[in-house]
């Protein structure tokens, strides 16, 4: 039964909670935490939804997957710069595009080097579609028929039965 006072579930374990805290402890002086930034005082591994703004492209929080309710915000002047920021990381699991301009959303989704791109939403998962990352975010796909194919190796064998 759902707990009505929980809006965001916990991170996976104590080590992950400590890892998230470490990222927030190391926020550079030029950046600012605009929301959250702390663990929730309750049983479990809960972290307050957190927004960190004014980060630079080479900052640790931009260049790593945090796996927590933490979002980083960077300014950009045009689509090309936004795509450079997004793709300028070694990971590529998932991304989101938020805009009222559907054409822009589709251009950016095409340009983003991520295994999953959500438009005007984040984290919906359906079993009919594959899920998996690009670059250092892993290999292969989960869910759907594509996930099954990750456990197979196709081999083509031909023989001459008259020999």
Could you say what each language-model-derived stretch is?
Residues 11-21:
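Short beta-strand to alpha-helix junction loop
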Residues 39, 46-163:
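Conserved C-terminal structural/oligomerization subdomain of aldehyde/semialdehyde dehydrogenase
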Residues 29-38:
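Short secondary-structure junctions
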Residues 4-6:
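Structured catalytic cores of enzymes that bind and process phosphorylated ligands/cofactors
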Residues 22-30:
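Helical element adjacent to the flavin cofactor pocket in flavoenzyme catalytic cores
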């Amino acid at each position: 039964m759902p707990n009505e006072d929980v809006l965001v579930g916990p991170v996976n374990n104590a080590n992950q909670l400590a890892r998230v805290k470490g990222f927030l402890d190391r926020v550079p002086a030029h950046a600012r935490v605009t929301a959250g930034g702390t663990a929730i005082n309750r049983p479990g591994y809960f972290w307050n939804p957190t927004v960190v703004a004014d980060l630079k492209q080479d900052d640790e929080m931009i260049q790593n997957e945090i796996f927590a309710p933490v979002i980083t915000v960077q300014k950009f002047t045009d689509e090309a710069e936004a795509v450079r920021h997004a793709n300028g990381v070694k990971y590529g699991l998932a991304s989101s595009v938020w805009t009222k301009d559907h054409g822009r959303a589709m251009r950016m989704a095409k340009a983003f080097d991520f295994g999953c791109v959500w438009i005007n939403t984040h984290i919906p998962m359906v079993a009919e579609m594959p899920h998996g990352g690009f670059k250092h975010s892993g290999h292969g796909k989960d869910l759907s028929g594509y996930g099954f194919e990750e456990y197979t190796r196709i081999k083509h064998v031909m023989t001459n039965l008259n020999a």
